Regions:
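Domain-level signature for soluble enzymes in the chorismate/prephenate branch of the shikimate pathway
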Residues: 2-284
Length: 284
């Protein structure tokens, strides 16, 4: 079984946030191109604990959405626990209204789903004033509960794979307000793994800078001079030091030597410099 540029033994478990049928599970299926052993976690904190305890060898974590932006707490988790990003995957998010078979939308009293899923489908839901919206922990878990308890009059918003897995009927497909809705996921390991440099053309970095004029501009100039393309920059406040920020950046490059040169310069210019991952660029 191959994951990007990494091979993974069949018995390696992968931690996901949510359960089978969730978007995290869908990423595993697309990235692996086949089923894999899954560790289902109710939160991202539990996912990280699972990885650190060696209960799973890999983890899949959502990190950014094209509409909602960065999932900032997940950046902090990766940094705090020194996790390594070994790959990425971009998933088109399609939300579907589903319920037990044989029902019409007019018979649905409540829709249960994750708050983000409800928000992404608000235009459709506003046209269904008879339906009460109920926030839940996970899209797929809601679908599973409807199936297990045979809950009539209750619908879920989840993926097509959840409908298939839990034998639900899709009452309205792709009800998300914005069709071009994509989430970026990263593949994580507990420990660093050596990767052939010819396979690497993207890196995720973290550093801190003194709060003085031109410090960030100088770093960005180095990246530009070394022929790196900045695809993401995210600042995160340092809780213990008010008004000081850590910067998380993603860069792509054609030649690893250019990246190596930039990395050596940034290690001198910035404090607390850290490589969060070096991997293959999968951005569409």
């Amino acid at each position: 079984m191959q994951i990007g540029i990494f091979f993974c033994p069949m018995d390696t478990k992968i931690a996901i946030q949510g359960i089978k049928g969730s978007f995290h599970h869908q990423v595993v299926l697309e990235y692996y191109h086949q089923e894999a052993a899954i560790c289902e976690c109710l939160s991202f904190e539990e996912l990280v604990d699972n990885l650190l305890a060696n209960e799973s060898g890999l983890a899949v974590m959502a990190i950014e959405n094209s509409i909602a932006g960065s999932i900032i707490p997940n950046y902090a988790l990766i940094d705090k626990h020194n996790l390594q990003i070994i790959g990425e995957h971009y998933l088109d998010i399609h939300q579907n209204l589903m319920a037990l078979k044989g029902q019409q939308i007019s018979e649905i009293r409540e829709v249960h789903s994750h708050p983000m899923a409800l928000l992404q489908c608000m235009d459709f839901l506003k046209n269904q004033p008879h339906i009460k919206l109920v926030e839940d922990k996970d899209t797929a878990e809601t679908a599973k509960r409807i199936h297990e308890n045979q809950l009539k009059g209750i619908a879920a918003i989840a993926s097509k794979s959840a409908a298939k897995l839990y034998d639900l009927e899709i009452l309205a497909p792709e009800i998300q307000t914005i069709n071009n809705n994509m989430t970026r996921f990263v593949i994580l390991r507990k420990d660093k793994t050596e990767v052939p440099t010819e396979k690497i053309n993207k890196a995720s970095l973290k550093f801190e800078l003194d709060h003085k004029r031109g410090s960030l501009a100088a770093v960005l100039n180095v990246m530009s001079d070394c022929k790196m393309n900045l695809t993401k920059i995210q600042s995160l406040p340092k809780i213990e030091t008010p008004w000081k920020y850590a910067f998380f950046v993603d860069v792509t490059f054609e030649k690893y030597d250019d990246y190596r040169k930039a990395k050596s310069l940034l290690q001198i210019m910035a404090s607390h410099f850290k490589v969060l991952g070096e991997y293959e660029n999968k951005q569409p």
